[in-house]
Design a protein with these regions (language model features):
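Class I S-adenosyl-L-methionine-dependent methyltransferase catalytic core
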Residues: 4-156
Length: 156
């Protein structure tokens, strides 16, 4: 019975069925997906980023960056051209909201193309430029993403 990642209704009983083979299609051990350098470089040529708002010592893309310790959500991003590849977990909506509220700066985001989410409809759709990426992004150190991606540009 442990072969699939969904619930099957069997009369009044529900069997939880999981698959080790397919779990990677839907979950990850970490919400962090390191930006591919070539994708960042292409966007940096266009936007000239000065700040990476969601980074670590190992994967920051700009010389100025905020890590977990600095808590990018509590920092001021205004007046700067920002790169944002946030953790893709439950907190992603907070990051997208903050990016959408930027004043006097630009925030370019690499995000999962989850067009069915509240954060997409509340902060992105009709309010930002969206560039859907063809195919699946190959994240540094992880291989192809199990989800489609998009670039979202907040440029008030």
């Amino acid at each position: 019975m442990d072969n699939w990642l969904f619930y099957r209704n069997m009369g009044n009983l529900f069997y939880k069925i999981t698959s080790r083979m397919n779990q990677g299609l839907f979950t990850s051990n970490t919400p962090e997906w390191e930006t591919p350098q070539e994708l960042f470089d292409e966007l940096d040529m266009e936007f000239h980023f000065g700040l990476d708002v969601c980074a670590s010592k190992e994967n920051h893309k700009c010389s100025t960056w905020f890590g977990k310790k600095e808590d990018g959500l509590s920092q001021d991003w205004s007046g700067v051209r920002c790169w944002m590849n946030p953790p893709y977990g439950r907190e992603i909506g907070k990051w997208v909201k903050k990016a959408s509220e930027i004043q006097g700066g630009v925030v370019v985001c690499l995000l999962p193309a989850r067009t069915d989410t509240k954060w997409f409809h509340d902060y992105i759709y009709g309010k930002a430029e969206i560039r859907f990426l063809k195919g699946r992004v190959k994240f540094s150190g992880k291989g192809p993403a199990p989800f489609p991606s998009m670039i979202v540009i907040f440029n008030p």
